[in-house]
């Protein structure tokens, strides 16, 4: 518990794919200080993505100092630090020197594709799915770690001698901030490694054997809300969650059936399924989320590949808008899309279709179609894809969506939010506080150290800026959605490939 009433602030460290951020919250969950620093992206080969772990730590440390200075407060006034992070990104370091043996291999990196293919050939795909809730894909940490051990000179031998440690970004930051005293991760991050059994809540010995990972290099796995240790300056480190799970908690989606959508370049949808690890029949991931006090809960996760990137395409390639914000104005100028559907399968289709050979297409063109209709169809495509995933989630878990909570850059678009409510037939809630990912980490840390009393107090702080209620008649809604599904079907299996 917090023993000093003068400790009136929580720091959330939000370590993302392109930048490190620090956000300071007061007891009312208001932002009182922020700082952000970008860091270098390294692309040594096509499909490879790396970060320098030392640069990640340096930028994250600097943002904390800068945010404190901006807020005009000292370390002594901070009750705790919460950490949220880009998930799956993999770091291996020497536990004596604290130096990485190789750059961090980023979640986007595809270098372990052949390792995944071999796992499938060896018949491990089904067990991986059942134990971890994940698909056998280079996205996740386990095959990245295997690649480092297999390809960095001396790494496997040193790991087997107990000289090297593994961690996702949360683990790396805590180890550095604690001066090498604490080697932990939380259940949400562990559930993204392809090495953690989400049912037993332990590292899976069979998977470690399959991947050839020495058990002693893995961190201890702990709940998302507890005091793990202290920084060298004496601040409690008290909350950890992967970025999407942190946003789910920041949105107070802690009961079964509650869901959030983060509208970014793509869209990340998570639905809380409570204490039930639901196995998806629709290609969704089963993952660990945070329960009411940061304990283990489960969630279904689905990703839409092209959300905000569709609007970027209108702006940068077609050049029919100058600014993403303008799309709301143009889409609202026409009463509907005039029968036009844009399926933005630029890189294939994600959940629930999983068709890498689908390609983007524009349907329903007539001489009466204007640019405004195409812009509107682009925004509508984001909402349609969200419904695709949420329908799959509801079918998988049997939970009816109570409302959809939203965050990310595109939620400022009122047209999109209203159409989202219309096509779902469900209320869409946009929070006043847009920093939901950082807020989730702050909440987890604050609950652990007694800064906030519990869920009721946090719910009181969850102010909805605007609720979008469905306004479309059921028959019209289903007619529009039927057209979308027809359009999607026409894009499937488009690119030539070997059967």
Swiss-Prot record:
What are the annotated GO cellular component locations? cytosol
Control of this protein's activity: Inhibited by fructose 1,6-bisphosphate (FBP).
Q: Please tell me where ATP binds in this chain.
A: 17-19, 265, 308, 312, 409
Keyword check for ATP-binding, yes or no.
yes
**Alphabetized PROSITE patterns for the sequence:** FGGY_KINASES_1, FGGY_KINASES_2
Q: What InterPro entries does the annotation carry?
A: ATPase_NBD, Carb_kinase_FGGY, Carb_kinase_FGGY_CS, FGGY_C, FGGY_N, Glycerol_kin
In this chain, glycerol is annotated as bound at 87-88, 139, 243-244
Q: Which SUPFAM superfamilies match?
A: Actin-like ATPase domain
Query: Which keywords does UniProt give here?
Result: ATP-binding, Glycerol metabolism, Kinase, Nucleotide-binding, Transferase
**Under which EC number(s) is this enzyme classified?**
2.7.1.30
Query: Which pathway is recorded for this entry?
Result: Polyol metabolism; glycerol degradation via glycerol kinase pathway; sn-glycerol 3-phosphate from glycerol: step 1/1
Q: Which GO terms describe its molecular function?
A: ATP binding; glycerol kinase activity
Q: What's its catalytic activity? A: glycerol + ATP = sn-glycerol 3-phosphate + ADP + H(+)
* Top enzyme class: transferase
Query: Which family does the similarity line name?
Result: Belongs to the FGGY kinase family.
Role, per record: Key enzyme in the regulation of glycerol uptake and metabolism. Catalyzes the phosphorylation of glycerol to yield sn-glycerol 3-phosphate.
Q: Mind telling me what this protein is named?
A: Glycerol kinase
């Amino acid at each position: 518990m917090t023993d000093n009433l003068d400790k009136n602030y929580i720091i959330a460290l939000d370590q993302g794919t392109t930048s490190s951020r620090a956000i300071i919250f007061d007891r009312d969950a208001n932002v009182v200080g922020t700082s952000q620093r970008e860091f270098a992206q390294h692309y040594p080969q096509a499909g490879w993505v790396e970060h320098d772990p030392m640069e990640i730590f340096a930028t994250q440390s600097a943002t904390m100092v800068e945010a404190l200075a901006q807020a005009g407060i000292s370390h002594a006034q901070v009750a705790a630090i919460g950490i949220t992070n880009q998930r799956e990104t993999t770091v291996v370091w020497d536990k004596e020197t604290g130096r990485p043996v190789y750059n961090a291999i980023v979640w986007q990196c595809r270098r372990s594709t052949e390792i995944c293919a071999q796992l499938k050939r060896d018949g491990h795909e089904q067990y991986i799915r059942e134990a971890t809730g994940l698909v056998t894909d280079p996205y996740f940490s386990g095959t990245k770690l295997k690649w480092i051990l297999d390809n960095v000179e001396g790494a496997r031998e040193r790991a087997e001698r107990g000289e090297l440690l593994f961690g996702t970004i949360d683990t790396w930051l805590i180890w550095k901030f604690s001066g090498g005293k604490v080697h932990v991760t939380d259940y949400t991050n562990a559930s993204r490694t392809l090495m953690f059994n989400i049912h037993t809540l332990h590292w899976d010995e069979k998977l470690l054997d399959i991947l050839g990972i020495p058990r002693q290099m893995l961190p201890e796995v702990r709940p998302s809300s507890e005091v793990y240790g202290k920084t060298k300056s004496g601040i409690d480190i008290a909350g950890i969650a992967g970025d999407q799970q942190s946003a789910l908690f920041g949105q107070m989606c802690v009961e079964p059936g509650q869901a959030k959508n983060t509208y970014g370049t793509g869209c990340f949808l998570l639905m809380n399924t409570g204490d039930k690890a639901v196995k998806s029949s629709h290609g969704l991931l089963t993952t660990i989320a945070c329960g009411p006090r940061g304990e283990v809960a489960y969630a279904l996760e689905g990703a839409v590949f092209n959300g905000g990137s569709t609007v970027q395409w209108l702006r940068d390639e077609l050049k029919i808008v100058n600014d993403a914000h303008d799309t709301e104005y143009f889409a609202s100028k026409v009463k509907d899309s005039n029968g036009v559907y844009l399926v933005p399968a630029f890189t294939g289709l994600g959940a629930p279709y999983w068709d890498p050979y689908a390609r983007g297409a524009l349907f329903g063109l007539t001489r009466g179609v204007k640019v405004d209709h195409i812009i509107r169809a682009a925004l509508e495509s984001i909402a349609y894809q969200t419904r695709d995933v949420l329908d799959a989630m509801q079918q998988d878990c049997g939970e009816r969506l109570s409302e959809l909570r939203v965050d990310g850059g595109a939620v400022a678009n009122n047209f999109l939010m209203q159409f989202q409510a219309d096509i779902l037939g469900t209320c869409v809630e946009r929070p006043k506080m847009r920093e939901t990912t950082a807020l989730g980490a702050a909440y987890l840390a604050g609950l652990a150290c007694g800064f906030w009393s519990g869920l009721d107090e946090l719910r009181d702080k969850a102010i909805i800026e605007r609720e979008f209620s469905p306004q479309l008649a059921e028959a019209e809604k289903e007619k529009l959605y039927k057209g979308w599904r027809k359009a999607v079907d026409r894009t499937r299996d488009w690119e030539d490939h070997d059967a």
